[in-house]
């Protein structure tokens, strides 16, 4: 039996191991297509700013071809470095495309204000054909996407600081699209807006330079359909991370956006580890979980073997991503989702509608959290040096805070406050025969008010009121005089208050659709 278990562990380990490079050793290359990427031919800020302006307008052209759009986006993504050409050559290793770098310089002879740098040959016509587009023959204005603020005509600037801010604003909006472009492009608008608001509040971007929705949709669709563009973006992120020392501000912003990009499409695997295993609930000891725990262990080892590309396996369309799907460990995943829903409110919006979802193990996770609330793990307590007395104290505090948390989830309860209102009528009060009690007219429309004294109170009445009846106080029906002087004084004060209230109601105008609200503290005390 020991040899069987050893063989099983070895089998599980080798089953998920990626294939090793062997055999003929030749790399398989596909049929490549050429991508033209314009880069600045000098260090002038004017050249870069003008190139950025032309590229943004090119991307906003709805009729732009796919390879041309990819080249324009690669050029925009690399404009923040000192030598874009060297960066592109260093990080690009794509079997599907061949990148051709073209240096761009200023020119007064072209319509676009830019031309391709060449030795002895004029490339003005080629530059105009690349950077500009022809208007339709029918005379209609061609639709193009630009910034939401249509008053912005161009983004050409002369100073480096202004150029960096405009470039950072455009790059932030492009990089934010990568997080959801592959996994959930249809529901990405809300999360993208939250990221944009965050960087606007941090003054990393300029809010006035928010790109048009059509422009962003064009770029998002291109990122989703072009693997080569995603490979370049991932390679650029990894190159920035490897850079030692202080990084440019735009590079730091890209690394910050990368926190939303990494592990995209791997939520099932990551959350299963977080809620199913790291919580260390005793339910992991069930026999049903034994096989799936072994699967998770082998997948974690495989994840580490993939290195720095592992968090981007879904974005890079790596075929090994299917091994990390929740379908490989459905029971453990269902249990982990139940634990997560109970522990974190953000898990409530997760979509569980999958064929391998098991409701029984989902409820197991929920009940495990509920019944283990406030309990301290003995193994963890011994490692941390927690005594039994301290463990009991922690359990008591955890139970108290758990009850407080449950109370907060229902939301604050607002006390109902009512006011005296002048309604469209009153009602004659019935005679009262009880001692130390006087009945006042009850006004009913939407709010009901009770005025209390020490021995006198008003009764509520739910009968409809007629607008033709006036509110009156029947003095003859007041309670008989008490022999106690103090009680008589209180009775007199209460009667005065009731009469004052009745006079206010009688003086009001009937038929008013917007009744006034009285909140006189002296009358309501």
UniProtKB/Swiss-Prot annotation:
Residues 477-505 are annotated as: Interaction with the phosphoprotein. RNA binds at residues 180, 195, 202, 260, 351. GO terms for cellular component: helical viral capsid; host cell cytoplasm; ribonucleoprotein complex; viral nucleocapsid. Residues 1-375 are annotated as: RNA packaging and organization of the helical nucleocapsid. GO terms for molecular function: RNA binding; structural molecule activity. InterPro entries: Paramyx_ncap. Residues 408-432 have a biased composition (Polar residues). Residues 433-464 have a biased composition (Basic and acidic residues). It comes from the Viruses. Keywords: Capsid protein, Helical capsid protein, Host cytoplasm, Ribonucleoprotein, RNA-binding, Viral nucleoprotein, Virion. Residues 404-525 are annotated as: Ntail. Residues 1-403 are annotated as: Ncore. It is found in: Virion; Host cytoplasm. The keyword Ribonucleoprotein applies. Residues 1-36, 373-391 are annotated as: Homomultimerization. Residues 402-490, 506-525 are annotated as: Disordered. Ncore is globular and carries regions required for N self-assembly and RNA-binding. Ntail is an intrinsically disordered monomeric domain in the C-terminus. Homomultimer; forms the nucleocapsid. Binds to viral genomic RNA. N0 interacts (via Ncore) with the phosphoprotein (via N-terminus); this interaction allows P to chaperon N0 to avoid N polymerization before encapsidation. Interacts as N-RNA template with the phosphoprotein (via C-terminus); this interaction positions the polymerase on the template. Interacts with the phosphoprotein; this interaction leads to the formation of membraneless organelles that function as viral replication factories. Forms the helical nucleocapsid (NC) in a ratio of 1 N per 6 ribonucleotides, protecting the genome from nucleases. The nucleocapsid (NC) has a helical structure with either 12.35 or 11.64 N per turn, approximately 20 nm in diameter, with a hollow central cavity approximately 5 nm in diameter. The encapsidated genomic RNA serves as template for transcription and replication; encapsidation by N is coupled to RNA synthesis. Forms the encapsidation complex with the phosphoprotein protein P. Before encapsidation, the newly synthesized free N protein, so-called N0, is chaperoned by P. Belongs to the paramyxoviruses nucleocapsid family. This is Nucleoprotein. The gene is N.
């Amino acid at each position: 039996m020991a040899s069987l278990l050893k063989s099983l562990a070895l089998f599980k380990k080798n089953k998920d191991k990626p294939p090793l490079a062997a055999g003929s050793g030749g790399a398989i290359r596909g049929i490549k297509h050429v991508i033209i990427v314009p880069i600045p031919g000098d260090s002038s800020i004017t050249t870069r700013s003008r190139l950025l302006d032309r590229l943004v307008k090119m991307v906003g052209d709805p009729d732009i071809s796919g390879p041309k759009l990819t080249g324009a986006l690669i050029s925009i993504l690399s404009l923040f470095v000192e030598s874009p050409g060297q960066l592109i050559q260093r990080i690009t290793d794509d079997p599907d495309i061949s990148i051709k770098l073209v240096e761009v310089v200023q020119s007064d002879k072209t319509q676009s204000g830019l031309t391709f740098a060449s030795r002895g040959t004029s490339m003005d016509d080629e530059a105009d054909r690349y950077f500009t587009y022809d208007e339709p023959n029918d005379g209609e204005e061609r639709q193009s996407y630009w910034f939401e603020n249509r008053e912005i005509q161009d983004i050409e600037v002369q100073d480096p600081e202004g150029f960096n801010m405009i470039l950072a604003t455009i790059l932030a909006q492009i990089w934010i699209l990568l997080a959801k472009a592959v996994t959930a492009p249809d529901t990405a608008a809300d999360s993208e807006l939250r990221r944009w608001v965050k960087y606007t509040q941090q003054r990393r971007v300029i809010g006035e330079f928010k790109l048009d929705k059509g422009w962003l949709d064009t770029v998002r669709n291109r990122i989703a359909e072009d693997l080569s563009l995603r490979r370049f973006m991932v390679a650029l992120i990894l190159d920035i991370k490897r850079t030692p020392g202080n990084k440019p501000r735009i590079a730091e912003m890209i690394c910050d956006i990368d926190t939303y990009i990494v592990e995209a499409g791997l939520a099932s695997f990551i959350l299963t580890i977080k809620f199913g295993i790291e919580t260390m609930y005793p339910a992991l000891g069930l026999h049903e979980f034994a096989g799936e725990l072994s699967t998770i262990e082998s997948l974690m080892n495989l994840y580490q073997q993939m290195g720095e590309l592992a968090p981007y396996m879904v974005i890079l369309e790596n075929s090994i991503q299917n091994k990390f799907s929740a379908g490989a460990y459905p029971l453990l995943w269902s249990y982990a989702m139940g634990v997560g829903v109970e522990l974190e409110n953000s898990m409530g919006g997760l979509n569980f509608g999958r064929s391998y979802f098991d409701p029984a193990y989902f409820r197991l996770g929920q009940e495990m959290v509920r019944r283990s609330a406030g309990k301290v793990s003995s193994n963890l307590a011994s490692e941390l040096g927690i005594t039994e007395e301290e463990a009991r104290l922690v359990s008591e505090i955890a139970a108290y805070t758990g009850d407080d948390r449950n109370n907060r989830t229902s939301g604050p309860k607002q006390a109902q406050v009512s006011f005296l209102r002048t309604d469209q009528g009153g009602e004659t009060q019935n005679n009262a025969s009880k001692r130390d009690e006087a009945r006042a007219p009850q006004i009913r429309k939407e709010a009901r008010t009770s005025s209390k004294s020490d021995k006198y109170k008003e009764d509520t009445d739910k009968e409809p009121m007629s607008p033709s009846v006036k509110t009156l106080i029947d003095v003859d029906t007041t309670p008989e005089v008490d022999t106690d002087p103090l009680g008589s004084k209180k009775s007199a004060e209460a009667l005065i208050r009731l009469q004052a209230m009745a006079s206010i109601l009688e003086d009001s105008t009937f038929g008013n659709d917007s009744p006034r609200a009285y909140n006189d503290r002296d009358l309501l005390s």
